[in-house]
Amino acid sequence: MKTLRTLIVEPGMAPRVAEVEDTLEAKQKVVGGLIEPVFPPSHKDDVCLIVNEEGKLCGLPWNRAIRLEDGTAYDIIAGTFLILRAPEDSEDFDSLTDEQIGIYTQMYA
């Protein structure tokens, strides 16, 4: 089974690097429910956040703010999320690069 190198961001915790199986079920297990990809405007590359689609409705704990390009917060994520690449020329998710792990570990620290 193919695995993806990702960052998992849990409420109140520092982001951590993890290998996650490239299956819908594995991603749903990490976020605790149905997944939804989110593409924050502050991200200048092909990275997306995989969040729990119903996190706010289910009352999951607040996690991190999502920001506009100027740094202004415009939304907040509820519950654990993971960060993956979502290349425009593909329908599949991909592993983060070492550079992206550094950038997003710092961004969501």
How does the language model describe each region?
Residues 1-109:
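Domain-length accessory/inserted modules outside core catalytic folds
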